[in-house]
Amino acid sequence: MSAAPREDGRADDELRPITITRHWLDHAAGSVLVEFGRTRVLCAASAAEGVPRWRKGSGLGWVTAEYAMLPASTNTRSDRESVKGRIGGRTHEISRLIGRSLRAIIDYKALGENTIQLDCDVLQADGGTRTAAITGAYVALADAVEHLRSTGALTGEPLTGSVAAVSVGIIDGVPRLDLPYVEDVRAETDMNVVMTGSGKFVEVQGTAEGAAFDRAELDALLALAEKGCADLTRLQQEALSR
């Protein structure tokens, strides 16, 4: 089935322009500004010796994450959740997703009793904020691990691989990769896929928004996501090599 060309002129299997800028902040152990087209997320990693109380004495480390959106990151200003006095369900969900995704490639024993906290703040949202956050957070995490190593806090290699994420969806019957907001809001099927650099799936979140999808469409979406995550993995490694 044919569909109207994408507004930004991309092919259906093409990522938006991706930029990964390291060392964005002076004080964080690792920091990255990641850009998926017009979506921009600042990912900062703080590293500290010690672990949460329930983890003490285990010899195991911990990695966790928090996600938030700046009030002016969308076209309509939203109040800060800290001012509201409670964290919304969507924010909790995405924070936990980022944490799970990063922990999938962590060797807790090699990390030792150290904690790495990732803070992912959306500066501008144009679809795919959670997948951009995961992709950028991995690079910040890798830099934080090197920071801990430079201070003598660890000697092993806690990273067992890399992790990246991308959105896919069906628009007018056609599977597409890396949806901006204008596509996301009218997608018949919307999916977020998290994968390791070795090609294994960490998480697949898929929802039929307008019409149910069949197995062939699911397979097509996963194939697109595999391609997208492989491209993102390459960009992550290029960023870390600079």
From Swiss-Prot:
The keyword tRNA processing applies. GO terms for molecular function: 3'-5'-RNA exonuclease activity; tRNA binding; tRNA nucleotidyltransferase activity. Phosphate binds at residues 90, 128-130. It comes from the Bacteria. It is an enzyme of class 2 (transferase). It catalyses: tRNA(n+1) + phosphate = tRNA(n) + a ribonucleoside 5'-diphosphate. The keyword Transferase applies. Keywords: Nucleotidyltransferase, RNA-binding, rRNA processing, Transferase, tRNA processing, tRNA-binding. Coiled coil: none annotated. Its EC number is 2.7.7.56. It holds the Pfam family RNase_PH. GO terms for biological process: rRNA catabolic process; rRNA processing; tRNA processing. NCBIfam families: RNasePH. HAMAP family: RNase_PH (MF_00564). Phosphorolytic 3'-5' exoribonuclease that plays an important role in tRNA 3'-end maturation. Removes nucleotide residues following the 3'-CCA terminus of tRNAs; can also add nucleotides to the ends of RNA molecules by using nucleoside diphosphates as substrates, but this may not be physiologically important. Probably plays a role in initiation of 16S rRNA degradation (leading to ribosome degradation) during starvation. Homohexameric ring arranged as a trimer of dimers. Belongs to the RNase PH family. This is Ribonuclease PH.
